[in-house]
Amino acid sequence: MSDALKDEIIKTFGTPCAVVDLNIVDHNIEHAQSLCNKAGVANRPHIKTHKSPVLAKMQIAAGAKGITCQKLGEARIMAEAGITDIIIATNLLGAAKCGQLASLQRQVPLKVCADNAVSLTAYSKAANDANRPIDVLIECDTGQQLSLIHI
């Protein structure tokens, strides 16, 4: 970025100001996707850092199978932007989250993750309330003690 452009950005927006060079972003997305393609693996980027439907759509256009969200609210924003292949990576607990999941599941088919029976029960209720099955990915602990289900 040139000094003149930096000065113009500071003058226009002040500081601090996040500036994203979309040419660099596009290059990085293409590079990450090419690595996945060469390895023969599906790319499902986690959007918890950028939280941007625009960037998520760029990732999908480059070849990502879908996206992964950390929270239900992130998934809702992505679904409202037209993204239809969404995994929610964390367990959703509580009646309020269950109701929100059912509401979103009526709009777009979701995949959720679970590592405990409480989450599975909540997902079953949400699927019944939505009148649509919910795909559940079971997270198993493979020795790193990051999950409640041990194999």
Indicate residue ranges for each PLM-predicted region.
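N-terminal glycine-rich anion-binding loops that anchor highly charged ligand groups
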Residues: 2-4, 24-55
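Generic N-terminal amphipathic, Lys/Arg-enriched alpha-helix
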Residues: 2-20
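Short hydrophobic/aromatic segments of transmembrane alpha-helices and their interfaces
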Residues: 8-9, 35, 103
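Short, basic, glycine/proline-bearing loop/turn elements
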Residues: 15, 41, 61
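Expand to "…catalyze enediolate/carbanion chemistry for C-C bond making/breaking, isomerization
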Residues: 16-17, 22, 26, 33, ...
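Adenylate-forming
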Residues: 25, 150-151
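Active-site-proximal beta-alpha core segment in soluble small-molecule metabolic enzymes
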Residues: 46-149
